[in-house]
Amino acid sequence: MKRIILSGMCALMFWAVPSLAQRGSREIPTPTDGLKDAYKDYFMIGASVNTMNVTDADQIALIKREFNSITAENAMKPQPTEPQKGEFNWEDADLIADFCRRNGIRLRGHTLMWHSQIGSWMYQDEKGNLLSKEKFYDNMKHHIQAVVSRYKDVVYCWDVVNEAVADGPVRPGRPELRESPMYKIAGEEFIYKAFEYAHEADPDALLFYNDYNDAEPAKSQRIFNLVKRMREAGVPVDGIGMQGHYNIYGPEMSDVDAAISL
């Protein structure tokens, strides 16, 4: 991880050089290789994109040069793809998926189940009452499998469930998971079911649990414990997605290393 963070700092330094050199008379050539080329023997380099990023010529050129994987920022989330039960809107997600197909860029699917940006029809009835577990599971299965099946030719991995672990100190007697409507209906089991439904739709896709503040020691341990329980229960989970909301003030590199090493 130290190598990854330091490489990002070096990249910023590299791009600062042309802006300074342009004050002189020398002409600085446009780079042809990007970060994806520098790290091709180690890992993929990705970015979060929206529809504007993949339709603007300058941004397209940058994406194609620097990245070999992209993630849809919002276009594949539950609310944008199925705002009402059975009424799908594929326009933005299709645009990003087609961009990846044309340019040979891999696509990370984000996200199939999240307490935010999700239609309330998924978990409650017209009167605002929570659905039974059976009805909720039926809605969730239909949604997940429709989305995964549509993009299985281009999406190589999915963030199946997003941000289900509670933040901060957990009070005695309270669950370690976020008390979302989905959790209130089915408890931790809804996470397991989401992964099962995604795996049924695309057995070849890598499936991840995704969250933020992963470098905070107490939360990283809760995330680790959740995924450990999932693995022990036979749930098809392949890894943990760590949202990199990092800046010069934090988190501490030692905490990031510790989270990865759990």
Residue ranges, per PLM feature:
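Short, acidic/polar
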Residues: 50-66, 93, 137-147, 218-230, ...
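Acidic-and-aromatic substrate-binding clefts and catalytic sites of carbohydrate-active enzymes
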Residues: 48-58, 78-91, 165-166, 213-222, ...
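Substrate-binding cleft and catalytic face of glycoside hydrolase catalytic domains
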Residues: 32-33, 65-83, 92-215
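Short hydrophobic-acidic sequence motifs that mark active-site Asp/Glu residues
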Residues: 46, 157, 239
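Short helix-terminating capping/connector loops at secondary-structure junctions
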Residues: 40-41, 102, 153, 235-236
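Aromatic- and acid-rich polysaccharide-binding/catalytic face
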Residues: 68-72, 162, 201-211, 223-250, ...
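Boundary/entry segment of secreted carbohydrate-active catalytic domains
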Residues: 24-69, 73
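Bacterial Sec-dependent N-terminal signal peptides
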Residues: 1-24
